[in-house]
């Protein structure tokens, strides 16, 4: 154990014991490490088609090593003025797809969390963090389906800045933030200006008193750059409990206004049925009104099942119509997502 000169001097004078000091420092390190969580995922897949060419996967039919993620974090502890951190890395094709730059390594998150004992408590996030809008996320295993919806590609992915989140009352949470750009993800949606972007969102959770709707959530979010030439995105989404056992519903709407005056909007409808223990069926229908004035639609059916521990295996069918460039297309995919 390395000690500073001040500690060594105190030990020589008999004020402290080197052994006890070393033990105290070791215990401090162990205490810090005990709250650190290491997690991540590894993804692999097979992409094919039924008859026509598969334009949905973005590459030729065949096997794919989608890549991996690795996260090291420490959650906010209870009590006032607590602190936390979060670092998340993407590797392989997942890094290339997310960053838009083709690199096999990408820093997705690098932020510090801070708690302020103000009102009901304010949680601050400083650094590089995920966007507050959107129904789907980068990790496919956390989504109802493997392939992303049209709306996902309209949204910003990450922001570098400051985000403040707090609960106004039971079931009502708000978030406001200031960031460097509409999207801080390298190679995607960056306007390359020094103007700030502003983030705002409100989440409402249905109380238990409303019967089968209890636990349903609705979120409204808005992200805008601080200039007339900046992009804007308005998002409304919700997860809805249904009266049918083991069936949940979802909806998402994205309206993207580009700095050059173009506009695109997307709507997605979701239904997930927990067929049995370890088996689920996820359905999605989504549409896109693109910047070129064309309308494109897609339906997706995803059968998920858990055979191996920590592995989500999913078989997915996609069918797209209305794409002027590629025409109608269908996809057949098998995806394995290991999470630790």
Stretches with model-predicted labels:
Residues 1-24:
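Gram-negative bacterial Sec-dependent N-terminal signal peptides
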Residues 6, 103-106, 194, 229-231, ...:
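Short glycine/proline-enriched turn or capping motifs at secondary-structure junctions
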Residues 25-184, 192-199, 203-210, 267-270, ...:
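Outer membrane beta-barrel
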Residues 99, 185-193, 225-227, 259-262, ...:
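Solvent-exposed loop segments that connect transmembrane elements
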Residues 198-292, 297-298:
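Detector for outer-membrane/organellar transmembrane beta-barrel domains
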Residues 204, 305-307, 328-340:
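Outer-membrane beta-barrel "beta-signal"
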Residues 258, 288-290, 308-310, 320-322:
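Short Gly/Pro-enriched loop/turn and capping motifs at secondary-structure junctions
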Residues 300-317:
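C-terminal closing repeat unit and adjoining cap/tail of repeat-based domains
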